[in-house]
Amino acid sequence: MTEKRNQNQNIAVRFLLGVVLLVSTPLLQATTYTTGINPGEWKTVSSVFECRLEQPVPLFGDIVFRTRAGEASGAYLRSKTARFAAGDAAMVARTPVWRPKQESINLGAVAMKQGTRPLWLGSKRAELMLSHLSDGREIEISNPAWYRESPEARLAVTTIGFRHEYSNYLSCLAGLLPANFDQLRRTAVYFRNGDAEYLNATARSHLDKIVTLVKHDPKIQKFYIDGHTDTVGDRADNLELSKLRAELVSQYLISKGIPAEQLVIRWHGERYPASSNGSWDGRSKNRRVTVRLEKLEASQPNTKPANSMAGVDPPK
């Protein structure tokens, strides 16, 4: 009787173990996020300020290739919730399942963070990914999942619909502005010793970029023009020299279509050096005019006359 009871218990245990294995085995497989053979839904978001090429991935989020005006390209993942654990993820380029199988190309390890922006790649990696996608290869990124029930999470970036939108993305890149607001919001142009009558090619190029940006961004409505000098010469003469430099830059901007009423012109002489006046290099950095841009939402009412006297307020 005891022997029969033990046999029944062994059968029950084996049955339960079998049920556990059947239930747990799928959970131990890698979780793959992909559009599969469905339309990839690639889309291009275009403006003169930024170009983005995006693919939404069901249950994951998006893979985004982005280039801002004046900057190098990049790529990042945008997920709805954390899907990957932190650590080095593997990235490969592979042939889609519907094409003759070829050996996958190892694109190296990429640093993954846990969170909703787990991955950011610089220009070199982003352009490499775009090149493989354009050639018809998928990109697969794999790393341990952040939750224990799945040993690995994989993201497959598909090529379906890619080439058409990639062409639109390239067209957008051709129309980007030469620089963005963050790059130009505080610009300095420099002068030769004692000079306040000549803007060299580099100075004109910087100012022209500002003009081009402003023509496409109506929110930029305030310009603070601050003139400076080094300490060579008389203090009073330097104050006048900084005024002439600030006025020269202001007149150039006005000649390019910037409304004069949007300019706040100030001059400070040698009061606010950007570098030490004890060296030639330092003095060359102090002979400058800075142009600071402000957007409408960030601007404060200006209660001072446009040609405010030097030294009343330090340049911001």
Role assignments for model-derived ranges:
Residues 3-16:
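Bacterial N-terminal signal peptides that target proteins for export
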Residues 24-25:
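N-terminal signal peptide c-region/cleavage motif recognized by signal peptidases
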Residues 30-180:
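N-terminal targeting leaders that direct proteins to extracytoplasmic destinations
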Residues 116-120, 192-200, 235-239:
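Second-shell loop/turn segments in exported
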Residues 128, 202-209, 240, 244, ...:
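Extracytoplasmic/secreted proteins, especially bacterial periplasmic and envelope-associated proteins
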Residues 138-221, 295-316:
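Periplasmic peptidoglycan-binding/tethering modules of Gram-negative envelope proteins
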Residues 229-316:
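Periplasmic OmpA-like peptidoglycan-binding domain that tethers envelope proteins to the cell wall
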